[in-house]
């Protein structure tokens, strides 16, 4: 890639600071007009297909809801909305940063990108916390793993993300450059310092904190799963090995999609005001543009993750009749304070052990069959 960098007031044709306003260097970004249309097109097709299938299973085949399935449903809704908006960006970048649509539509497309990004992060965090409770505190997970609690948490996530991303609708704008109309993904020059401050707050609140929570949850889960059970010898059981692989896969995908994007975007915004060489700034700009498709790819990877982690959903898609979920035993209900039947100590220990093993598939209860956004 030829650098071909010149000062901001250069008169040759090209793009300045990629597709942003107020930058001092001109970048040759021919790679972007191939990379972004192709990658967004693939994400659009795969994301829509996978998430539509997931929504069909959730709405038409799944009869019993728990916390994990509730969070996955909302995750699929968010991914579907974002994938449906990608054809506009495919057209935009294929035309060489020309936006023939309205400014309102430009704002909406950028808003959907960030809304999907942070909804995915927060819903993955909710799923991680729920799984962590299921491994570390099975009986507490039995009580708090019901869909009615998860629906309330999901509603809070939507309200929080929509409120936090509402300023994007104010900052994002369009501008005319010769015969082209550019749809910026930041702000106008006079508002850029405010946009950087806003983005820094979002970085900490909606990425750094959830990522730390997910990391802690999966470290605790891995320690518990890798610890041999009392009185056993040899390697890990097959179920535990699969759980450990799932943990590693979730962390890897999370880091692949979200971490590079946030790191390069932070550098991209921070270095714009510094007196660095255009070659250095060009490298940072290129890295940021390359990680944007990675952030979008979570719309395709989310369904794969929860299909792999939740084999019950695969069985629901394959079988004509979903399997009947087990109900909490009287002993487990007694420990949760629901009622206190008299049982022998031996039977109590036996059933409690069974409950701990099946915590992951705890039913949400009869009142959780209706799902509301």
UniProtKB/Swiss-Prot annotation:
Effect of residue 107 to I: No effect on receptor activation
Keywords: Cell membrane, Disulfide bond, G-protein coupled receptor, Glycoprotein, Membrane, Receptor, Transducer, Transmembrane, Transmembrane helix
Regions of this protein lying in the Extracellular compartment: 1-32, 94-110, 173-194, 270-287
Region annotated Disordered, chain positions: 318-373
Compartment list: Cell membrane
Top-level lineage group: Eukaryota
Name the record gives this protein: P2Y purinoceptor 2
Species per Swiss-Prot/TrEMBL record: Mus musculus (Mouse)
Gene name of this polypeptide: P2ry2
């Amino acid at each position: 890639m030829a650098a071909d960098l010149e000062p901001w007031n250069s008169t040759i044709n090209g793009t300045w600071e990629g597709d942003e306003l107020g930058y001092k260097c001109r970048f040759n970004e021919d790679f972007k007009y191939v990379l972004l249309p192709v990658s967004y097109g693939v994400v659009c097709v795969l994301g829509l297909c996978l998430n539509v299938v997931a929504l069909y299973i959730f709405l038409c085949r799944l009869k019993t809801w728990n916390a994990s399935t509730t969070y996955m449903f909302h995750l699929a809704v968010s991914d579907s909305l974002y994938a449906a908006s990608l054809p506009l960006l495919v057209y935009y970048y294929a035309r060489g940063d020309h936006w023939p649509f309205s400014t309102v539509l430009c704002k909406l497309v950028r808003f959907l990108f960030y809304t999907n990004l942070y909804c995915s992060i927060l819903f993955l965090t909710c799923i991680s916390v729920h799984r962590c409770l299921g491994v570390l505190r099975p009986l507490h997970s039995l009580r708090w793993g019901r869909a009615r609690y998860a629906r309330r948490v999901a509603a809070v996530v939507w309200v929080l993300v929509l409120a936090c991303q509402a300023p994007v609708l104010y900052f994002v704008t369009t501008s005319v450059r010769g015969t082209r109309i550019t749809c910026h993904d930041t702000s106008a020059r006079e508002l850029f310092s405010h946009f950087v401050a806003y983005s820094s707050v979002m970085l900490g609140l909606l990425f750094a904190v959830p990522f730390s929570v997910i990391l802690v949850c999966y470290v605790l889960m891995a320690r518990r799963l890798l610890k041999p059970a009392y009185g056993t010898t040899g390697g890990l059981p097959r179920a535990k090995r699969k759980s450990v692989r799932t943990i590693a896969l979730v962390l890897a995908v999370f880091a692949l999609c979200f971490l590079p994007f946030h790191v390069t975007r932070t550098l991209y915004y921070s270095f714009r005001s510094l007196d660095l060489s255009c070659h250095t700034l060009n490298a940072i700009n290129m890295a940021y543009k390359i990680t944007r498709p990675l952030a979008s790819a979570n719309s395709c990877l989310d369904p794969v993750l929860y299909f792999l982690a939740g084999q019950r959903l695969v069985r629901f898609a394959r079988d004509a009749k979903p399997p009947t979920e087990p109900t909490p035993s009287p002993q487990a209900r007694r420990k949760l304070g629901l009622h206190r039947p008299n049982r022998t100590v031996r039977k109590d220990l036996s059933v409690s052990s069974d409950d701990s093993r099946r915590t992951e598939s705890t039913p949400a209860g009869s009142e959780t069959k209706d799902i509301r956004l």
